Curated annotation (Swiss-Prot):
Keywords from the UniProt entry: ATP-binding, Kinase, Manganese, Nucleotide-binding, Phosphoprotein, Serine/threonine-protein kinase, Transferase
Protein name, as recorded: CBL-interacting serine/threonine-protein kinase 4
UniProt-annotated stretches for the region PPI: 330-359
SMART domains for the chain: S_TKc
Organism whose genome encodes this protein: Arabidopsis thaliana
SUPFAM superfamilies hit by this protein: Protein kinase-like (PK-like)
Single GO term (MF): ATP binding
Gene: CIPK4
Ligand binding (ATP): 27-35, 50
Function: CIPK serine-threonine protein kinases interact with CBL proteins. Binding of a CBL protein to the regulatory NAF domain of CIPK protein lead to the activation of the kinase in a calcium-dependent manner.
Pfam families: NAF (PF03822), Pkinase (PF00069)
CC cofactor: Mn(2+)
CDD domains the UniProt entry points to: CIPK_C (cd12195)
All residue ranges annotated as the Protein kinase domain in the record: 21-277
Length: 426
């Protein structure tokens, strides 16, 4: 069977890793890891593989950072603007993190080449970053190191948030819900983080987004000084100036994001509601379905698959952890109906209650979620024309004996929905 992935000009050396990937050129390296492009032997797909020296991570105390990165990416891997994690493998001396290959490289490189971006291009990247971070925050994850060097581009030029090594997961918060670890890159770091007091990770990320948008439009960071103490003073005093070419709406957003007081600082969700942000917005209404599904499933069927330090750091033999990402069985179908979107949502909720599911409705986006045990169903409705709607139905079961359960729940849904369905598709 011919591979669905087109042949790439990437040079692959022929070195085979654990019988699964052919290694190619080195993309980058650090003190304890190096990254190579590689090709999957089974599919032909290009991926990036981060090869981590286990002993060096132990010696430098970096293993918690690796665990955070893997666990955050695992939880967020369905958002189109978060770099996807495919699998984790390990040997006695190495950890192999296999992720999506971002052929466009770092956004930082593009900024160096062009100096600054026009407002339309800057807005597109900012929209994608805000969408990804909003998704992270709804799952209780703060990135804490947002900067162009950690934002990659795929071959279509879409932004991919990467490097979750400094991220904070929900379980890292103290009893008052705040974070206390000072981290990040100084020029992008919020003043409350610098002050080393408890802080809200989402608000700290919002500050970094303000710096990011300024950098895209101006071509330089708003707070810059060779003396780090002087730079921190500027950050606390909001001491910066806008170049003349930045528009008033963009200035307003940046100013509100760069509010030294986190209590009054604009949130990322508030930014997403502004006219400036929504101009030329390319995100499809259908895109949210996968995000809603995974968030709903995470709440309904808490998985015990969290990757532990023992799993990765203390391994004494080869191990393929790809199963962590293959435990869910999905089935989906689309139908049209000559009723209102509200009627479809109402009907789906009634079906859920009848079949013994817990029902959650997200009215503003016409999404209804049904949960029972380790099964989640999501129905998302979009009005296609007056009196005609299109609905996506997804059933997911997480666990070992999932095939029969998926078919069982699927059959029940089909029968109950027939009353309103005009026609089924795919």
């Amino acid at each position: 069977m011919e591979s669905p992935y087109p042949k790439s000009p990437e040079k692959i050396t022929g070195t085979v890793l654990l019988g699964k990937y052919e290694l190619g050129r080195r993309l980058g390296s650090g003190s304890f890891a190096k990254v190579h492009v590689a090709r999957s032997i089974s599919t032909g797909e290009l991926v990036a593989i981060k090869i981590i020296d286990k002993q060096k991570t132990i010696d430098s105390g970096m293993e918690p950072r690796i665990i955070r990165e893997i666990e955050a990416m695992r939880r967020l891997h369905n958002h189109p603007n978060v770099l996807k994690i495919h699998e984790v493998m390990a040997t006695k001396s190495k950890i192999y993190l296999v992720v999506e290959y971002a052929a466009g490289g770092e956004l930082f490189t593009k900024l160096i080449r062009f100096g600054r971006l026009n407002e339309s291009a800057a807005r597109r990247y900012f929209q994608q970053l805000a969408s990804a971070l909003s998704f992270c925050h709804r799952d209780g994850i703060a990135h804490r190191d947002v900067k162009p060097q950690n934002l990659l581009l795929d071959k279509q030029g879409n932004l991919k948030v990467s490097d979750f090594g400094l991220s904070a997961l929900p379980e890292h918060r103290s009893n008052n819900g705040l974070l206390h670890t000072a981290c990040g890159t100084p020029a992008y770091t919020a003043p409350e983080v610098i002050a080393q007091r408890g802080y809200d990770g989402a608000k700290a990320d919002a500050w970094s987004c303000g710096v990011f948008l300024f950098v895209l439009l101006a071509g330089y960071v708003p707070f810059d000084d060779a003396n780090i103490v002087a730079m921190y003073r500027k950050i606390h005093k909001r001491d910066y100036r806008f170049p003349s070419w930045i528009s008033k709406p963009a200035r307003s957003i940046i100013y509100k994001l760069l509010d030294p007081n986190p209590e009054t600082r604009m949130s990322i969700e508030a930014v997403m509601g502004t006219v400036w942000f929504q101009k030329s917005l390319e995100i499809s209404e259908f895109q949210s379905s996968v995000f809603e599904l995974d968030r709903f499933l995470e709440k309904e069927a808490k998985s015990s698959n969290a990757i532990t330090a023992f799993d990765l750091i203390s391994l004494s033999s080869g191990l393929d952890l790809s199963g962590l990402f293959e435990r869910r069985k999905r089935k989906e179908k689309r139908f049209t109906a000559r009723v209102s979107a509200e009627r479809v949502v109402e009907k789906a909720g009634m079906i859920g209650e009848k079949l013994g599911f817990r029902v959650e409705k997200k009215e503003e986006t016409k999404v209804v979620g049904l949960g029972k045990g380790r099964t989640a169903v999501v129905v998302e409705v979009v009005e296609f024309a007056e009196g005609l709607v299109v609905a996506d139905v997804k059933v997911v079961v997480e666990g070992e004996e999932e095939e029969e359960e998926v078919e069982s729940h699927w059959s029940e849904l089909i029968v109950e929905l027939e009353e309103i369905v005009l026609s089924w598709h795919n």
